[in-house]
Amino acid sequence: MHVLSNPKHVTWLTQMGLDQIGEAYWQLGVPELVEHAIHNSEGVLSAEGALVCSTGKFTGRSPQDKFIVEDEKTRDTIWWGPVNNPFDSKQFDALYEKVTQFLQGKRVYIRDGYASALPEYKLNLRTVTTQSWTNLFVNNLFLRPIDKELTKFSPDFLILQVPEFQADPHVDGTKNANFTIINFTKRVILIGGTGFAGEIKKAVFTVLNYLLPQEHQVLPMHCSANVGTDGNTAIYFGLSGTGKTTLSADPNRKLIGDDEHGWCDKGIFNFEGGCYAKTINLAKESEPQIFDAIKFGTIVENMRFFAGTRTIDYKDSSITENVRCAYPLEYIPGALIPSIGSIPKHIFFLSCDAYGVLPPISQLDKDQAIHYFLSGYTAKIAGTEAGISAPKAVFSACFGAPFLPLHPTRYATMLADKLEKYEVTVWLVNTGWIGGGYGIGKRIDLNYTRAMVTAALSGELAKAGFEKDAIFNLSIPNACPEVPTHILNPSNTWNSVKEYELEAHKLMEAFASNFALYCD
């Protein structure tokens, strides 16, 4: 639809200071957006029909360039610090004006969508982008209104994303030329200087992480979720690379969502309408559902083709390790639509432990669950970042610190209340190393991890009984179907028990130092 044909749209554009734009396209269909992207030289089609695009200079988020406008609404509520940088409200107004002036005479793509599959918590989103592929990304990742809903659509938040606009840090108050700024009072997300579409997704997640606990007492969670044929829901918390998307894409269970959910008294619900999966080393044998979702309508970011073909080389990380694809949830066979589940029966905390000292799976009591939730532990390994030559413990509160506008203890308290109220079993799963740390041991077989998760869900682990780990005081199952018993206790897999204990105590000390941040 050409925007200038609709008086209602013209009125809105005028109110937002966008009335001087040039060509404007509202709610284009997927085929039209793909055509525009190819015509605009934004991307090309792969052999499977997916749209392969480059995000430009930025191939990931820039957390240090994310800001929240500090005003009366946010001054005493935001968890200010390295995660949430304050931005002056007057400087925001000036920068917004500069961005809208920059758009004069330029082509834009506008899309209405919403977050939250549960209607009572719906957040209507209107996104304005300068690139058609980014508009397709928004279509794939957020929930898609039907025609009847569009006629009455009124946005709760405006997202304005202009990669071509470069801020002047000395004048505009940013740290660099790129920025993501959230204004809760004016309900605007302003993004400039970066073409990485994931900034849009995570800015909306940050908004929900602020609004839902304060206005609705809903716990927002950085987790994936699925449900079994018996109706039992499970959720999987984890940082990037821990297996959150992989483990939730189970052919024997229906996928609710792969990344962002809310937990209310009715159950859990997906915030999104799509998935944003990593594709580095993707193989049909190990992740068939994700592999088959890469087809027409899907976006693939920063991937290369095999020479002389349009076949994607999933092993090519020459642009970035953070290669991803964005597709609608419906592209996963058997996905649960609408994506709403019951109160979870099981929670899995996924940690990629590169020290090789955490058990492959262990059961947590309520106090341990809150401890590990606040810790949000995983590990970086040598080679993943400049300057990392040995495993490094990484703690990200609630398994999602970069997206938490409120203090982590606010979310931890909400989780503790739910663990008290409902019968939920919490598990810690090590998807990392066994038999020694990185460089000595080996990464645990994905098939073993799947078998342990399946046994936890079916009750087989509980039937087998548990033994207490001597260092971490974790409850380790005595047996698990399809998994060698000797690997269940990590001390059994090391050549030297003494070396195991030394490394385990190092990790314990790192946990203690990090947890001290929340003890006051």
From Swiss-Prot:
Q: In which pathway does it act?
A: Carbohydrate biosynthesis; gluconeogenesis
Where, subcellularly, is it found?
Answer: Cytoplasm
| Residues at which ATP binds | 202, 222, 238-246, 287, 324, 443-444, 449
The record's catalysed reaction(s) read: oxaloacetate + ATP = phosphoenolpyruvate + ADP + CO2
Pfam families in the cross-refs: PEPCK_ATP
GO terms for MF: ATP binding; metal ion binding; phosphoenolpyruvate carboxykinase (ATP) activity
Reported cofactor(s): Mn(2+)
Enzyme class, first EC level, given as a word: lyase
Cysteine pairings via disulfide bonds: none
- Annotated Mn(2+) binding sites: 202, 222, 259
Give GO cellular component annotations, separated by semicolons.
cytosol
Note the InterPro entries from the entry.
PEP_carboxykinase_ATP, PEP_carboxykinase_C, PEP_carboxykinase_N, PEPCK_ATP_CS
Fetch the PANTHER family from UniProt.
PHOSPHOENOLPYRUVATE CARBOXYKINASE (ATP), PHOSPHOENOLPYRUVATE CARBOXYKINASE ATP
Which HAMAP family does UniProt cross-reference here? PEPCK_ATP
Q: What does this protein do?
A: Involved in the gluconeogenesis. Catalyzes the conversion of oxaloacetate (OAA) to phosphoenolpyruvate (PEP) through direct phosphoryl transfer between the nucleoside triphosphate and OAA.
Which protein is depicted? Phosphoenolpyruvate carboxykinase (ATP)
Native source species: Amoebophilus asiaticus (strain 5a2)
